[in-house]
């Protein structure tokens, strides 16, 4: 059986586990069995948090020396949506026309399957042991609140004395074809609620009331008028987006007492969460003057900005991609947040996996040929990494 076929069979086994967060549905067990059979020491660790579901996680390692390369990812998936809209069952793992179908095919059970297949191939070619250490850090809590997953598993590993030299997260990083993009960082994310207080009253007597709606509209305009920055060497400009405006007023003859607007900021490495909040508060105060009564309620966030500077590790991954695909990948920091933000606090990390065009969609799918290529790229990474 070829390694690409191994990746396919592993992916199918994972896809047939309906592991919608927080359910595991046997997905971690599939990986644990494969890795234990290959000589890994595996640990299943369950974390709890008040108000959140308990989540099972997997950490497996082979080898006890440096360098230590970690593959990280998640086996949980988003809900499939309308089951009847799928041309193949969302958890069928069916292959038709060279395409593998299933929720998680690209995000990111397919990527995990390729990493496992590549590692098994590498070990088979090198006497069953790496010239260093290889680990898998896999959570079932990435697609939801992400409080009982990677962030706690990393701390658990650190408390045991585990250290990582580099990490690859198998998120679907590519835009159109395998090898076109490596994610070397992510913007931070901070959400908040802008609240403007007015004075409720009858619309026929506006002089006896204070309407917060024109005021919140003016503040939204003011906060959007001036850019937060011009971007940096690795990041696009930071961006503030208002996502809703609400007054909770069902009446047409009552001026509301309060208006609220939700917003999110995706910010680059010019800012920290604290400095960003201070900047927005300063601009809000200037826009309010002495007339408008407004404040911001900031929502909790664990999504800090991070970047892995291009260097030997990104060069190694780039060379492995070029060998298999002939492409030179773009190193970028676009897109949303991922668990790589937690890993970046422990070691340099990049994200490289399948093509993300169908992730979270009905009929999520990946070409089987892409599984072949990604497995070959990961094999190349392993060969270079443990020779360097």
From Swiss-Prot:
Per the record, the GO terms for biological process are: diaminopimelate biosynthetic process; L-arginine biosynthetic process; lysine biosynthetic process via diaminopimelate
Q: Which residues bind Zn(2+) 1?
A: 74, 107, 171
Which residues does UniProt mark as catalytic? 76, 142 (proton acceptor)
Q: Subunit details for this protein?
A: Homodimer.
- Annotated pathway: Amino-acid biosynthesis; L-lysine biosynthesis via DAP pathway; LL-2,6-diaminopimelate from (S)-tetrahydrodipicolinate (succinylase route): step 3/3
Which cofactor(s) are needed, names only?
Answer: Zn(2+); Co(2+)
Reactions performed catalytically: N-succinyl-(2S,6S)-2,6-diaminopimelate + H2O = (2S,6S)-2,6-diaminopimelate + succinate
**Keyword tags:** Amino-acid biosynthesis, Cobalt, Diaminopimelate biosynthesis, Hydrolase, Lysine biosynthesis, Metal-binding, Zinc
Into which EC class is this enzyme placed?
Answer: hydrolase
| Molecular function, one GO term | acetylornithine deacetylase activity
Give the co-factor note.
Binds 2 Zn(2+) or Co(2+) ions per subunit.
Q: What is this protein called?
A: Succinyl-diaminopimelate desuccinylase
Pfam families assigned to the protein according to its UniProt record, in alphabetical order: M20_dimer, Peptidase_M20
Detail which positions bind Zn(2+) 2: 107, 143, 360
| Protein species of origin | Rhodopseudomonas palustris (strain BisB5)
Q: Which CDD domains is this protein grouped with?
A: M20_DapE_proteobac
EC number(s) stated in the UniProt entry for this protein: 3.5.1.18
The record's similarity note reads: Belongs to the peptidase M20A family. DapE subfamily.
Gene name of the encoded protein: dapE
């Amino acid at each position: 059986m070829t390694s690409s076929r191994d990746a396919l069979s592993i992916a199918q086994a994972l896809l047939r586990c309906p592991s919608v967060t927080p359910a595991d549905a046997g997905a971690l067990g599939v990986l644990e069995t494969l890795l234990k059979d290959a000589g890994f020491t595996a640990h299943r660790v369950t974390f709890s948090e008040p108000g959140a579901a308990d989540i099972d996680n997997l950490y497996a390692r082979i080898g006890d020396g440096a360098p230590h390369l970690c593959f990280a990812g998640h086996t949980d998936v988003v809900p499939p949506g309308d089951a009847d809209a799928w041309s193949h069952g969302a958890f069928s793992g069916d292959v038709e026309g060279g395409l593998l179908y299933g929720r998680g095919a690209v995000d990111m059970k397919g990527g995990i399957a390729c990493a496992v297949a590549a590692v098994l191939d590498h070990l088979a070619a090198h006497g069953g042991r790496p010239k260093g250490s290889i680990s898998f850090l896999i959570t079932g809590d990435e697609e939801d609140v992400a409080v009982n997953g990677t962030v706690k598993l990393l701390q658990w590993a650190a408390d045991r004395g585990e250290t990582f030299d580099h990490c690859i997260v198998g998120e679907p990083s590519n835009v159109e074809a395998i090898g076109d993009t490596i994610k070397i960082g992510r913007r931070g994310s901070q959400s908040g609620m802008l609240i403007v207080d007015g004075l409720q009253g009858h619309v026929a007597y506006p002089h006896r009331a204070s309407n917060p709606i024109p005021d919140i509209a003016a503040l939204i305009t003011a906060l959007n008028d001036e850019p937060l920055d011009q971007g940096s060497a690795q990041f696009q400009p930071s961006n503030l987006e208002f996502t809703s405006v609400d007054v909770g007023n069902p009446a047409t003859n009552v001026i509301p007492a309060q208006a609220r607007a939700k917003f999110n900021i995706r910010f680059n490495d010019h800012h920290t969460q604290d400095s960003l909040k201070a900047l927005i508060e300063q601009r809000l105060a200037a826009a309010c003057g002495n007339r408008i009564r407004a404040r911001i309620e900031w929502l909790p966030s664990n999504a800090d900005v991070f970047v892995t500077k291009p260097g030997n590790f990104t060069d190694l991954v780039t060379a492995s991609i070029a060998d298999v695909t002939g492409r030179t990948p773009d190193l970028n920091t676009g897109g949303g947040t991922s668990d790589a933000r937690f890993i970046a606090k422990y070691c340099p990390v990049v994200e490289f996996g399948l093509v993300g065009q169908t992730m979270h969609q009905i009929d999520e799918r990946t070409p089987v040929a892409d599984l072949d290529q990604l497995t070959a790229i990961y094999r190349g990474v392993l060969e270079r990494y443990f020779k360097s």
